[in-house]
Amino acid sequence: LSLPRTQWKLCGIIPQANSMTRLCYSEAVKFESFDERLDYLKLWDVPHTSPRSVSMSLYKHKRWLITRDEIIKRDLGCDLGVFGIYIYGPIYVHHLNPITEQDIEVWSDVLFDPENLIATSMDTHNSIHYKPAATQIVERQPGDTKLW
């Protein structure tokens, strides 16, 4: 699926978020390559604030820990669920749609919805939230290191 971002089908509307378009896992996995999935999921051009002041109550809760384990198993420990791109080191479970303090305070279903969650590495998680992806890896070719 190599469609321009403007043509991507998104999963719907989040009523609480002023009609913000909702990303979802079932759409993300239709993109076969890691780069396409990363581009679909990037949030660095979407304004949001992280609810760090209350998020620890979520991330230490038994329900979250169970949900987190289920998502890691579903994605087979692979970055963005792309088979073969295994995560070595800490595995982050990313909310595709940013959560709010209110979501945590009322224990909104969006916190635990598998359609709103995906396994990522720390580098990928940071790329989704804070910066464009690093330079793509270029496949080496014979003679590409010649100086003259």
Task: Give the location of each predicted region.
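Histidine-centered nuclease catalytic patch
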Residues: 83-118, 132-137
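A boundary/linker detector
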Residues: 1-66, 83-89, 136-148
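A detector for short metal-coordination/catalytic motifs
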Residues: 114-116, 123, 127-148
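Short cysteine-rich loop/turn motifs with clustered Cys
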Residues: 63-97, 121-123
